[in-house]
A protein has these predicted regions:
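N-terminal export signals
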Residues: 26, 32-52
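Short, cationic motifs built from Arg/Lys/His that form the positively charged side of catalytic pockets
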Residues: 30-31, 221
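Short, aromatic- and cysteine-enriched interfacial helices/patches
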Residues: 4, 8, 46, 51-55
Length: 261
């Protein structure tokens, strides 16, 4: 998945703008929406943008993405559960997914690792893995859905994020939980608070009955079965409760921030 390049279209040729927007847009659903006949007038109505000579396809994509985020957030039902499956349905082998090879995944020493918790919380501190392992944990067998079009079913065990947020005295009126990861390029991702408080959103420490493998995000990933895979950050090293939208690795490249599955 490559980075979106800037594209300015002099004179705003309508067919060219829609063609380039279709090619640049990463989400297949939105790509089909534009390719299926969305006119510039419709896009202007939806995004609130006035298409002018200086308007770029990239800017149009940002506005459509912002609109989509708002719609998805509005219709999100915090009480609706992602489907669960029997353990017999687990995908074997469960695929590794990343923008780098598995041998280049972060190799973290769990004895030295700590989860830094900061932002709008009463209890700002760094949690050791041993401390986190002592928290109550639950298992879920849910489907991981990748933005690239494939899916796989896995078994994940960990602490519900909403329970941890309550434990640290997080201000759950805040807009986001923002996660920083140990990936080579400094992967990070925001999670809207409604999704963070969903009962299935989990701080994951195990895959199956084993400690979370390196390939799947050791020592901790955030499992969000109601969202696409890139919204499930791995190798998490810090969590911040905030009202500020700080962007994210893929979000900054044009992917929807909400990205419900």
């Amino acid at each position: 998945m490559g980075r979106i390049r800037k594209l300015l279209i002099p004179g705003v040729d309508k067919k060219l703008l829609v063609r380039d927007a279709t090619r640049l847009m990463p989400d297949p659903t939105r790509r089909r929406f534009i390719a299926g006949g969305a006119s510039l007038g419709a896009l202007t109505l939806l995004t609130g943008c006035d298409v002018s000579d200086s308007f770029s396809a990239e800017e149009m994509l940002k506005q459509v993405s912002k609109f989509n985020d708002g719609v998805q957030a509005f219709i999100f039902n915090p009480n609706a559960l992602a489907p669960t499956f029997p353990e017999s349905a687990i995908t074997k082998p469960f695929p590794f997914n990343g923008y780098y090879a598995v041998e280049d995944a972060p190799d973290i020493d769990g004895k030295d690792w700590k989860l830094e918790v900061r932002g709008l919380v009463d209890n700002k501190k760094s949690w050791t893995l041993e401390e986190l392992y002592k928290l109550p944990q639950v298992k879920q067998v849910t489907r991981h859905i990748c933005v690239e079009g494939w899916s796989a079913i896995g078994s994940w065990t960990g602490t519900p994020l909403r329970d941890f947020l309550k434990l640290v005295g997080a201000d759950t009126r805040a807009k986001y939980c923002w996660f920083q990861c140990a990936d080579p390029d400094g992967y990070n991702s925001p999670l809207d608070m409604a999704s963070a408080l969903h009962s299935q959103t989990q701080m994951t420490f195990k895959f199956g009955d084993e400690i979370l493998p390196r390939a799947y995000g050791y020592p901790m990933k955030i499992r969000v079965p109601t969202k696409l895979g890139f919204k499930n950050p791995k190798y998490v090293i810090s969590m911040e409760v905030t009202n500020d939208y700080k962007g994210g690795y893929w979000e900054d490249q044009g992917y929807n921030s909400f990205s419900g599955s």
